[in-house]
Curated annotation (Swiss-Prot):
Coiled coil: none annotated. The keyword Transmembrane does not apply. GO terms for cellular component: extracellular region. Disulfide bonds join 38-75, 43-64, 49-73, 53-74. This is Defensin-like protein 91. Its main location: secreted. Belongs to the DEFL family. The keyword Signal applies. It comes from Arabidopsis thaliana.
Amino acid sequence: METKKISYFLLPSLMIVALIFQPMCSAFTIAEPYIHPCMKGFCSFKSECANKCIFMGHHKGGDCIGGLDGIYCCCLA
């Protein structure tokens, strides 16, 4: 039984294709800048939300995000 060898052209070609498609695939992932779950009731002022998140240990603070059922305080990741 005869085994076929991978050509010296095919392997580098596949590596180049993989290096091209990897950044393209990673560009389609959605990066969420907020830590979930968001908290309801801390958005009377934006600074109130930021202070609450800093108190919880999230050093970047927080932001008020409006949703269908109210305004939420979401801490920044």
